[in-house]
């Protein structure tokens, strides 16, 4: 009886963690998808954006005693600034119609710069507060509600708020209409007098802002080190690719598929074959991503479901 209760409790915690992780992946994958649609840049620095947010949240906590949840608006702004700086750095390459490979290498360089800056900053912060800040978690600062972690409710609320805000922006404002037009056909949008440059700038600012917020929430579920961004970028890309890099909704679909699959499959493999399998969680994401590329190269949102249904009905 006790073993059964412990098993049920363990599965509840894993499912709870899977939903939290998926919520954060949605925020990060959405930013990656936005910048890819508008500028055709596969941003390998997206994970490091989040870790910048994590360390800013840590700074506000250690120096000013501000709860990480209350620092989310600040992280939104800081992330937006990082996204803006990245776009300004990449803009000359984009203007010259640089290849995807060159843009990818440029974002990798930016990621390495951010990694170095974050590592150096963690050492400076350690000297200021008098204890090592190279790695940290916020789990002990979280609250609980109805037996669930507070981060579950906060991350879910942030995702819902984001989706409502994006819907209102894209479908209820003139700028949103211009943004959608720029995403679907930049050349035609420019011909029609739409300021494509402004929409590109906005997408990078929003991408950084979302990553900053995700970074503030990430320490509530896992330990953060300066290189954490380079670990989670695998799952971020997997989420965007599985959902479909050509549609914003793909980030939502892919985020939950990758987040839940990675968490649950890793848990059950570890339960069956030992805890050594816990370190291979990212391999699950890669396998799902590769399988998706083989079956549906443009992701789930890129599948012509009506055509597929007709083919299945005639066979």
From Swiss-Prot:
The chain crosses the membrane at residues 14-34, 49-69, 70-90, 100-120, 150-170, 201-221, 224-244, 250-270, 283-303. It is found in: Cell membrane. Keywords: Amino-acid transport, Cell membrane, Membrane, Transmembrane, Transmembrane helix, Transport. One of its GO terms (biological process) is transmembrane transport. The keyword Metal-binding does not apply. GO terms for cellular component: plasma membrane. It comes from the Archaea. It is a multi-pass membrane protein. Pfam families: BPD_transp_2 (PF02653). GO terms for molecular function: transmembrane transporter activity. Belongs to the binding-protein-dependent transport system permease family. LivHM subfamily. Part of the binding-protein-dependent transport system for branched-chain amino acids. Probably responsible for the translocation of the substrates across the membrane. This is Probable branched-chain amino acid transport permease protein LivH.
